A protein has these predicted regions:
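Conserved small/polar residues in nucleotide/adenosyl-binding loops
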Residues: 1-6
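Extracellular acidic, Ser/Thr/Pro-rich low-complexity tracts
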Residues: 19, 64-68, 143
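Solvent-exposed loop/turn segments flanking beta-strands in beta-repeat/beta-sandwich domains
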Residues: 62-100
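Aromatic sugar-binding surface patches on proteins
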Residues: 102-124
């Protein structure tokens, strides 16, 4: 699979010959439907520990359990009031797929994406959150092609004017 392709997606590929001067089609159109492969999923767990909170500052430690591959761990904050856990997890997954696709268009290889945007064994996250908002601290495994290959483990948290609730 090309890093620019979306996993488990159907594509219609077509080809035909054209005259380079008149731009007229010279051959019949050939069409073929192809489906990209879905990544093989693995069953891995992540420990997400909120180490400390002070006001709107949060310190999180994410550890991979019995998994030595690459993973993504972040805090997602683009949560709408009507979003359910399922819709937020879909947004997180789609956001990663979109980013991998964009990096591919920019010439990044899977290895470059893995080395710059993923982690192994553990990751510490320190952020200052916005007041009166909902966030998801999350982690998921990625394969050698930088595609998500595990369920997303998450903890939802909210903030009020001055502090974090979890």
């Amino acid at each position: 699979m090309c890093i620019r392709d979306r996993p488990n997606t159907e594509y219609l590929v077509y080809a035909y010959g054209v005259d380079p001067i008149t731009i007229e089609r010279l051959t019949p159109i050939s069409k073929k439907t192809l489906t990209t492969l879905a990544p093989q999923t693995i069953d891995t767990k992540f420990d997400i520990q909120i180490v400390s909170t002070e006001g709107l500052n949060i310190d999180v430690l994410v550890k991979a359990n019995d998994y030595d591959g690459h993973f993504v761990a972040k805090i997602y904050g683009s949560v709408d009031a009507a979003d359910t856990d399922a819709t937020v997890l879909e947004k997180i997954s789609e956001s990663w797929i979109d980013n991998v696709q964009i990096y591919g268009w920019m010439g990044y290889t899977a290895e470059m994406i893995l080395s710059q945007y993923t982690f192994q064994q553990s990751r510490e996250i320190q952020e200052t959150l916005e007041p009166n908002s909902k966030y998801y601290i999350y982690a998921f495994a990625v394969d050698d092609e930088a595609l998500r290959c595990s369920d997303i483990v998450f903890i939802p948290i909210t903030t009020n004017d001055t502090s974090i609730q979890h």
